[in-house]
């Protein structure tokens, strides 16, 4: 039978952890100064006046490499617990992990063939 009172501490933690950031934003909005002078609108470069254009555009290639990094970072997050409990889980979980890695390899090869990893 599913008993909800077993999760009381979870709900208390969820409510408190949601309330603290909201409270922090409200307090900073109330206590923060509201002046919008020229110093507030200028960009900050190591305490000196900025020279040249302070707004630079990043090349889209940086985002592609960051996206590929996130994919393999998520793969690590999923495969590490699996590797730590490999002897307990059995063959079916091994096949699922193998299919997961195979899908990631196929996606990486596809991105490589399409030129997503080229820097030109």
Curated annotation (Swiss-Prot):
EC number: 7.1.1.-
A Pfam short name: Oxidored_q4
Gene Ontology MF: a single term: NADH dehydrogenase (ubiquinone) activity
InterPro entries to which the protein is assigned, alphabetical: NAD(P)H_OxRDtase_bac/plastid, NADH_UbQ/plastoQ_OxRdtase_su3, NDAH_ubi_oxred_su3_sf
Compartment(s) where it occurs, according to its Swiss-Prot or TrEMBL record: Plastid, Chloroplast thylakoid membrane
Parts of the chain that traverse the membrane: 9-29, 64-84, 88-108
UniProt GO BP: photosynthesis, light reaction
Membrane topology: Multi-pass membrane protein
Catalytic activity: a plastoquinone + NADH + (n+1) H(+)(in) = a plastoquinol + NAD(+) + n H(+)(out); a plastoquinone + NADPH + (n+1) H(+)(in) = a plastoquinol + NADP(+) + n H(+)(out)
Keyword Iron part of the UniProt annotation: no
GO cellular component term, pick one: chloroplast thylakoid membrane
Cysteine disulfide partners in this protein: none
Subunit comment: NDH is composed of at least 16 different subunits, 5 of which are encoded in the nucleus.
Function, as annotated: NDH shuttles electrons from NAD(P)H:plastoquinone, via FMN and iron-sulfur (Fe-S) centers, to quinones in the photosynthetic chain and possibly in a chloroplast respiratory chain. The immediate electron acceptor for the enzyme in this species is believed to be plastoquinone. Couples the redox reaction to proton translocation, and thus conserves the redox energy in a proton gradient.
Protein family (similarity comment): Belongs to the complex I subunit 3 family.
Name of the protein this chain belongs to: NAD(P)H-quinone oxidoreductase subunit 3, chloroplastic
Organism: Glycine max (Soybean)
Lineage of producing organism: Eukaryota, Viridiplantae, Streptophyta, Embryophyta, Tracheophyta
């Amino acid at each position: 039978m599913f008993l909800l009172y077993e999760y009381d501490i979870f709900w208390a933690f969820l409510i408190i952890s949601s309330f603290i950031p909201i409270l922090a934003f409200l307090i900073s909005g109330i206590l923060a100064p509201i002046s919008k002078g020229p110093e507030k609108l200028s960009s900050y470069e190591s305490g000196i006046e900025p020279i040249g254009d302070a707004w630079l555009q990043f090349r889209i290639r940086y985002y592609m490499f960051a996206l590929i990094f996130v994919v393999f970072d998520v793969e690590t997050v999923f495969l590490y617990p699996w590797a730590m409990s490999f002897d307990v889980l059995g063959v079916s979980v091994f096949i699922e992990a193998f299919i997961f890695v195979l899908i990631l390899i196929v996606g990486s090869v596809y991105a490589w063939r399409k030129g997503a990893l080229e820097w030109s």
